[in-house]
Amino acid sequence: IDSFLDANLVFSREHQVYILSIESLSEYTYDRMRSAYEFYLDGIESALSKSEYISGNDLTLADISYVCDFSQFLREGKYQEILKNQGFKIISQDIKDTHPKSINHLLNLSELKEFSSIMGSYLDWYKN
């Protein structure tokens, strides 16, 4: 779990910089975020190919942290026009094809009462 949480912190730092600068995004920041996204989700895909949850066969802090932090990153979907006007696309737009285990895990967990009672309809635009 510790190594996942370390990777999660790095990803979270990158997505905070990305989201906070999204209205005047540099190519450097966008490319950094894209690299962090791919590295992070490649790790999630690998973990989920071995077990039902990120860190084994039971729900752990790794899964909870993933839902919270990755959902925050997905706010980029609300900035599609702003990104497009700057010549960028939503980094996560192909997630269902490139990282299907990751998005399915997120959406499945978000349906659990413990998550849905807090998240509400936050992820609805990714469910289609």
What does each of the following model-derived ranges do?
Residues I1-K50, L74-N85, K89-I91:
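Conserved C-terminal alpha-helical bundle
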Residues V10-R13, Y53-S55, S117-M119:
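A structural signal for short, well-ordered beta-strand segments and their strand-loop junctions
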Residues R32, S51-A62:
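All-alpha amphipathic helical-bundle segments outside canonical DNA-binding/catalytic cores
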Residues K50-S51, L112:
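Alpha-helix C-caps/helix-loop-beta hinges
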Residues Y66:
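Short active-site alpha-helical segment characteristic of glycosyltransferases
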Residues D69-S121:
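Short His-centered aromatic/hydrophobic patch
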Residues G120-N128:
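C-terminal helix/juxtamembrane-tail motif
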